[in-house]
C-alpha cells in the first residue's frame, strides 16, 4: 500500500526521485532578500533553517558567511529522510542537515538561535505548532524570515498546470494495476488463457498511455515510468515476476510522490488571511512581526510571501 497521506513519506520518497522541482532563488527574485537578511548576522551567529528541503536557504547562509569572512553555526532540519549524498555535501559547506525532524516538535532548547528562517517549507508543517516552535527557537534580539508560497504565485499556477497535464495523461485506466495483476498471476501460476488476456489488456493500456503522453511529452515527469511500462509490456514473460512487481511498486511510488508533492503545494499556498493568522501566532509568542511583503520574480510575477520578525532585545 502506498502511504500517500503521510507528509513525511511524500517528501522522503520525493527525494529518492532522479528529478526534482527546484524553487530557484535567483530566478524568483529571492537572492537579494536572503542576502540582506543573512548578511546582518554577526560572526558566530547560530542559525536554524526549518523544513530545509534541498537546503537552498541553508546553503545561501553558508555562502554569505564565506563571502563575508564570517562563521555561522547553521542547523537545517526537515521532516523527510534526506538523501545521504545531500547531507554530506551540505556538511562540507558547514551546514548540519538533519532529517526526520518535525518542525512542529523541535528537539532544541528555547532561545537557542540568533536566526530562524525557512524558504517554501514551514507552511507545509502543522499549524500553528510549527510557527510557535519557530518562535520558541529565537533568542532575545534574534531575527527571522519566512519565504512562503503565495496562492497567486507563478509557482502555484505552474503546479496547477502540471497537475492538469498529469491527470490528462494518466487518464481513466490504471496501467500499474493491470501490470500488478499480470505479474501476480505469473507468480501464482495463472492459466495460459488468463495470462494471454491479461497481457493483451496490459499492452493495450500502455499503448493508450503512450498516445496520451505524446511527443514532446505532455508530462515529462511520467517519461521514466512510461518507458519502464513499455519495456515490460513488449514481452512480459521474459521478466522475473517478483522482480517486476518490486520495480512496479518503485515506479508507481515515483509517480505518486511527484503528484502528491504538487498537490501539497496547492494545499499550503497562502492568502492574506493566512498571513494574518501566522502573524498572530508569532506575536502571541512575544515576537514583533512586520507586515507581509509580496516578492516578485525577475518577470514581475508574484513569487512568494516574505514575512520578517524579531524578538525584542532584553532591556
Regions found by a protein language model. Give the residues of each.
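Class I SAM-dependent methyltransferase SAM/SAH-binding core
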Residues: 46-48, 53-105
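Class I SAM-dependent methyltransferase Rossmann-like catalytic core
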Residues: 1-42
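Conserved class I S-adenosyl-L-methionine
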Residues: 145-175
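A short SAM/SAH-binding and catalytic strip from SAM-dependent methyltransferases
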Residues: 115-128
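Substrate-binding/catalytic lobe of Class I Rossmann-like enzymes that use SAM or dcSAM, i.e.
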Residues: 176-288
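A short acidic, Gly/Pro-enriched loop at the edge of an enzyme's catalytic core
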Residues: 104-116
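Core SAM-dependent methyltransferase catalytic element
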Residues: 286, 295-315
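A short glycine-rich, Lys/Arg-flanked "PGG" loop and its adjoining helix->strand segment in the class I
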Residues: 129-140
Amino acid at each position: 500500500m502506498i502511504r500517500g497521506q503521510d507528509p513525511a513519506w511524500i517528501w522522503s520518497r520525493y527525494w529518492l526521485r532522479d528529478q526534482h522541482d527546484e524553487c530557484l532563488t535567483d530566478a524568483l527574485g529571492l537572492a537579494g532578500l536572503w542576502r540582506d537578511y543573512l548578511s546582518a548576522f554577526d560572526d558566530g551567529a547560530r542559525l536554524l533553517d526549518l523544513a530545509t528541503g534541498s537546503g537552498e536557504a541553508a546553503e545561501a547562509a553558508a555562502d554569505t558567511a564565506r563571502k563575508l569572512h564570517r562563521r555561522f553555526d547553521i542547523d537545517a532540519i526537515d521532516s523527510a529522510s534526506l538523501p545521504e549524498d545531500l547531507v554530506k555535501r551540505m556538511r562540507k559547506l558547514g551546514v548540519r542537515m538533519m532529517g526526520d525532524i518535525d518542525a512542529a516538535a523541535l528537539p532544541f532548547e528555547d532561545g537557542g538561535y540568533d536566526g530562524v528562517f525557512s524558504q517554501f517549507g514551514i507552511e507545509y508543517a502543522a499549524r500553528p505548532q510549527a510557527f510557535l516552535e519557530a518562535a520558541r527557537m529565537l533568542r532575545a534580539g534574534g531575527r527571522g524570515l519566512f519565504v512562503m508560497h503565495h496562492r497567486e504565485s507563478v509557482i502555484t499556477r505552474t503546479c496547477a498546470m502540471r497537475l492538469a497535464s498529469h491527470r490528462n495523461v494518466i487518464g481513466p485506466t490504471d496501467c500499474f494495476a493491470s501490470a500488478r495483476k499480470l505479474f501476480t498471476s505469473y507468480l501464482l501460476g495463472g492459466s495460459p488463457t488468463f495470462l494471454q488476456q491479461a497481457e493483451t489488456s496490459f499492452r493495450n493500456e500502455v499503448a493508450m498511455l503512450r498516445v496520451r503522453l505524446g511527443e514532446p511529452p505532455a508530462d515529462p515527469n511520467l517519461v521514466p515510468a512510461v518507458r519502464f511500462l513499455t519495456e515490460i509490456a513488449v514481452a512480459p514473460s521474459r521478466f522475473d515476476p517478483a522482480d517486476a512487481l518490486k520495480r512496479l511498486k518503485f515506479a508507481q511510488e515515483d509517480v505518486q510522490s511527484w503528484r502528491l508533492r504538487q498537490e501539497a503545494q496547492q494545499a499550503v499556498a497562502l492568502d492574506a488571511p493566512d498571513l494574518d493568522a501566522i502573524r498572530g501566532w508569532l506575536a502571541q509568542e512575544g515576537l514583533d512581526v512586520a507586515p507581509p511583503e509580496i516578492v516578485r520574480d525577475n518577470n514581475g510575477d508574484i513569487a512568494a510571501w516574505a514575512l520578517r520578525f524579531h524578538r525584542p532585545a532584553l532591556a
